[in-house]
Amino acid sequence: PLWGLPGNEKAKTGLSNDMTVGNIAELAQDDSIAFRLRCEGEAPPRSAMYYRGPVLSRLDGQKWTGSGFPRAPSNQQQAERAPAGSAADTVRYEVLLQPHQMQWLLTLDVAVTPPALPAGWRSLQMASMEWTSHRPITDVLRYRASSQLNYHADASIPAPYLRPYLALPPGLNPRTRELAQRFLN
């Protein structure tokens, strides 16, 4: 999600580590360019251009934050064997990412292989399938990536890796908790 970055008097829309309930309405819109993307060959339709950045998967009742869990090696191997889209669904592209002071590498959803970064840069895929760099993006960064637009994750991902995405905040309305449990079963 593209949310508020702490700034001068008012936050601007941008990448953030968290989002608090009710604060999104207070964000000032920022028309500056966040990144540019150039596809090899034909670009996918706009409706397929969902960009994966930070995934805010934990809610404490008031604030969403990211889980920060890197993928386990066995989970990575499962993802590589998972049924993905056809070769026709693979999009290869180049990203020119503007500095955002965070570590996220924006990719079309879902980049199942590491983005090709310049020398001296390393990437890590998180459990939520977002890609991060080993250091904050403080200058313009150019990299190549490839994504499968119709990717489907392996349904046999171990429960410990799913738990953060299924957790409910404390103090939740009992009827809401009951409904959530029905969804999980």
What are these model-predicted stretches?
Residues 1-185:
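Helix-boundary/low-complexity linker signature
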